[in-house]
Amino acid sequence: MREWCMLRESRTNTPRRAAERGKRPGGSSVRGGERRIVTALCYDLVGSTDLMHVMDIEDYQELMSAFQLASKQAIASHSGVMQHEAGDGGVALFPIELEAKDAASLAIRAGLGIVEACKRVGREAGQDDLQVRVGIATSVALVLEGSREGWTREPVTGAALAMAARLQAITAPNSVLVSEETRHLAGRSYAFVFQGSKELKGFAAPEKVWRALGHKVGVDRFYAFGRMGGPLINRENELNTIGQLWDGVLAGQGSVVLIQGDAGIGKSRLLREIRRRTRAKRSKLLFFQCLPGGFRSTLHPLLNNLPEAVSGSAGQMGPTAAAVAALFERNGIRDPAVVDVFSYLLGAQGSRLQSNEDPKAIREKAHRALLRALEAVCRRGPAVVAVEDVHWIDPTSRDLLGEAARIIAKFPVLLVTTSRPSYASEWLDAANPTRLALRPLDSDETRLAIKAKWPEHRLALLPDLFDATERISGGVPLFIEEICQWVSQNVEPDTMRLSESANPSHVSAFESILESRLQQLGTAREVARAAAVAGTQVTLPLLRALLPDFGKSALANAADTLCETGFLTRIRVPGRTAYGFRHTLIQETIYNAVLRKQRQVLHRRLFTAVNQNRGMAAWIDTGALAEHAERAGLVEEAVPLFIAAGKESSSRSAMIEARQFLEHALDLCGQMSESDTAEALKLLALTALGPILIGTVGLSSEPARRLYEDAVEIARRRPMSEQSQWFPIYWGWWLTGQDFRVMHDRALEVRSMLSKANEPEIQLQVNHCIWAIDFNLGRHRETQDAIKAGLALYDEKRAKESRTEFGGHDAKVCGLGQLALSLWLTGRTKASDAALSRMIAFTDRIAHAHSKAHSLDTEAVSAFYRDDFERLTEVSARMADFAKRHKMQSLSGQSLLFSGWAEAHRTGLASGHARFQNGLSLLRELGAVADLPIYLCMHATLLGLAGKIEPAIEVVNEAIGRGEETGHAYWLAELHRCRAILRARAGERKDAVAADLRCAVEIAESQGATALTRRARHSMRELGIVIGR
């Protein structure tokens, strides 16, 4: 039995707070400040200003002095230190030398003492209504090394001071309000009343706040969990549920399970038990691990099952198609079509699919490949597919996982996924997954878990261990494992004290435990930090680049020590040994504890080394390397890499990831100072993002139009020698013009600007935009001239790239189609037929999806012109089939519209008109109504045939107005002819009918549209209208 075992690996990590600790720039040994827990107290008299107005000034001053003296005594008697004193209030801090629990407890006692002191001072002064408000908060603060003795006299960097002031402001008179962190630390010693979650000015998230009522004797609360390798505790209900689902799988009914829980709660442990219990009857286990930072890395759970992709063996950057085929074959998947699709999506070298294929077609192929892969996997019997930590999944993997979940019921497969509870998993809802939410253990289960882990010769320490576990772990199993291990190894029976810097929040508590353990490991502590910056995978050569002052043997010994102590694990990859963190949470926590400037130094070293030699860490792809550059502060180096990563994703039809990379590149450009370099980088990002935005948001969308307008504004500032480089920007600016007149003016401007450019492709695309606009403006001679000039420059090899850069379709397909339509309108029917045949044959040969859609649209319009309803029915059917296969909504709308038009004329007016209206509604909803005047003309005609003359005239009036407003002129003659016929049927005056027919003739003749002139004159004869030439 083979498993797809995911090598744990992270591209980069999310940086947080901290500051540099370094002996010298670039030095590998870093020292300086550290993060400590600080509790702050803020107090303020209620209504002191009003008192000043009603009391004698001397009496008021004596009252304030007595109050401040009593308040300071209450603070000092509980180890607090005044930070700031105002006339009627002040701020105090409680020393970092105290354990965090004690500092919080003493601060609350001081606060309650201030309330009592205020009451006493008021009574003695005859002011019984004297009242005070007290706020207390706890947070992490940065304490610089060397200033620890006088830390309270230095500015304190932390949230506690600001939060305490905010809490004081909302506290009821003569009350003490404390933050969630403070209550968490001191909760065993005081009674608290929950006051709800409050919005505090300057803080993004609501804060849970509590009112302190007074001291009370200790309240025991125990939290615990089972160790990964120990007995499984408190999971029997979940296992029974999964057992029932597995029985269904054995009977042929697939199921989806989503296990949710906080980091470290035991999701992986439960999954391990599932693997153990299904081992006897399953034929295969496929295991995938999603990783931090993997959201932008296409199919990264699959990619990291490939040794080449992880190790960069043989100098490869990423996998080869042969490696993908070998991996699939080892797991029983031998279908070449399946291997080809996944090789393409992975960006494997030697992939046989073309990068310019339509993204929707690729997605459809991927779904079919997934279906075949599942069939192959189940060929020998039931299987288990496990995907861990889907909260880090990339969009492409999520799409495929969602599709797998949707169809899994057809196969004997148990699909198990795990995620954190905050992750939005509605994309799995269609599969109706069984959701299992893991909770912490209760007190009895805690005792069982700790006894299973605890050495028998130290059982006497268990009561104290329970107390420490309650304060530190918060019921998270992995935290308890680390706490137990550290306490059992380092805590003496007569002290039973943990780190003084134990933090109130669960994650920071774990950070304190890990930091305490790392301090015992000497230089291995620096190696662990460097490895955390690199990600959850690192090699000795990479560590050498990150820590240049360490020798090879020192690094190897440190890595071995970290493996022996449970921080790292060895990962065997071809040609070398790599190291990965035993759990992603360990890597994340160590990374977050590294001060920001130290992280920046390490990221910079990593970027420099890997950028010079990508083979050193081939698992770090372009996007990940860009993130290292960004976190190193090398924004100018990061932006081109993010752009390159976006292009790589786009070439694999991973449009969501591509858009994310490119939009982030633009954000970084905005952070750069105004410079020539920043402008050029921004244009490069916009050039790549524009076509993606058009494809994902829409051609007529405001975001696409605004992007190109902003880009052109920048491009115009660039030197004339660069203008041809930014031609795709100008082309997109033309394409997203709000109407045809604007588009025509822009096309002429671009042609004038780039008239001296010698590149044939630029000149072709200039003509491409001109013939498209001139056609719609009814300028047929100019249209045909532009097509002739443009197609003379067509290069089929270059066109493979241009199809994605310019409009998403092939210029030759567009040119031949536009020529066919223009020739018919100008009365050259045979030449039109020939051009149409050439277009269809060429489109079928190049097999480009969007170009085929363009061709089908042209075929349908051509049949519409000719009133060839039978031909239009056949073309519409092909349009519908193609739209369904490639998920093209606008083409689906056009198929409904044209098939409805044909049906209304051939078989059923009512049913055909209804189908037509469905198509028109869909196109309007999508914003894909560039030919709206024509569609409205068709709509008005069908209304007229149904005898609904007045509504028909209203529709054609709208169409004429839209055509005149937008410059959409080539069908204006037909619109006037249509209105003349409707007016005649409505019995309107003959001069109104004649006026419309006169306009139709004049417009058609001015455009050289012979076919439309003939129609207008034929209608004159039918209606008995005589108009001189």
From Swiss-Prot:
Single biological process term from Gene Ontology: cyclic nucleotide biosynthetic process
PROSITE patterns cross-referenced by the UniProt entry: GUANYLATE_CYCLASE_2
Keyword set includes Nucleotide-binding: yes
Pfam families: AAA_16, Guanylate_cyc
Single GO term (MF): ATP binding
Domain (Guanylate cyclase): residue spans on this chain: 39-168
Segments traversing the membrane: none
CDD domains: CHD
Region listing for Disordered, in residue ranges: 1-31
Biased composition (Basic and acidic residues): 1-23
GO CC term, one of those recorded: cytoplasm
InterPro entries to which the protein is assigned, alphabetical: A/G_cyclase, AAA_16, Nucleotide_cyclase, P-loop_NTPase
Binding site for ATP: G261, D262, A263, G264, I265, G266, K267, S268
Keywords: ATP-binding, Nucleotide-binding
Record PANTHER family: GUANYLATE CYCLASE DOMAIN-CONTAINING PROTEIN, TESTICULAR SOLUBLE ADENYLYL CYCLASE
Protein's name in the database: Uncharacterized protein R02095
Organism: Rhizobium meliloti (strain 1021)
Phylogenetic classification of the source organism: Bacteria, Pseudomonadati, Pseudomonadota, Alphaproteobacteria, Hyphomicrobiales
